[in-house]
Amino acid sequence: MNTTKFIDEHLYPGQIGYFLTILSLIASLVATYSFAKAFFSKEISVQAAWEKLAKIAFIIESLAVFSCFIVLFYIISNHLFEYKYAYMHSDKNLPFEYLLSCFWEGQEGSFLLWSFWHCVLGVVLLATKKKWGSSMAGVKIGRAHV
């Protein structure tokens, strides 16, 4: 892909955000599939292997979503208006406390905020494994991302 870089144009945040979005999508699909396989497995060793893969995939997904949140905040707070989302939903005159509300003003930011809170819920479910088994984690996490 041949891209023209203009003076004072910041392309890396957008490329990083795009990569993190794709990574979170793939990791969520792997986590959902792995939790389902763990739930339907009859052997304990196979179930444990699928659960381990599912947890790793979900942690990767959560880190990608949290990082994407940080990248979008970087774009908004530094007023990188070459990105449509920052151009449409923020302003240089906004005080710092209102820049955070720019996240959920647009559809993309609302979806990112929704994914963020689902990742927080999933991390809580994974942290309380003794109370919630892989079946509950798979249902909640799978329902959140599919």
Q: Each PLM stretch: what is its role?
A:
Residues 2-143:
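Polytopic transmembrane helical bundles with strong interfacial aromatic enrichment
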